[in-house]
Amino acid sequence: AEELPGIKNIVIHKIPKTHDNVIFLDKNDQKININEYTGNLLILNFWATWCEPCKEEMPSLDKLQANPELDKIKIFPINIGKETSNKVNKFFIDLNIKNFEPYFDPPTTLAKMFSLRGVPTTILINKKGQEFARVIGSIDFEDKNFINWIKKYN
């Protein structure tokens, strides 16, 4: 895996990885399957309310969803802290998050599937539904280098 010039924490896979049955829940406990979003650039951000770096990066991730240059992007912030929806909603309100809603993985199946070592970890999935890169730890998602790079996948 190669490091992206100018941005720490990004790991790019030489060969994109396929993950089957990437399923998680929305706030109404409805199942979301990423296969339904083939053709979109997907960002799965794994986080928890007690995670300070998650709190720092979430507003920039929220702005990324609203970026007009990235019309094919769909961001799923997936809580893997086994936290209540009240706690999660308060976290989003406190941070003034406007452009996406929280999602949940209560059994933390995805943490195992993606071999997550900690939060935040962000998985980047191309339009074919394959993981092509990941961010280990937090970054500023409004960083120009990041946006110029991610635009190529939009």
Regions found by a protein language model. Name each.
Residues N21-L42:
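A short beta-strand-turn-helix
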Residues G39-L41, D71-K74, N99-F100:
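Loop/turn elements at helix/coil->beta-strand transitions in domains of secreted/extracellular proteins
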Residues E56-L95, P106-M113:
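Structural microenvironment flanking redox-active thiols in thiol-disulfide oxidoreductases
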Residues K90-N99, D105-K151:
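Thiol/disulfide oxidoreductase modules built on the thioredoxin-like
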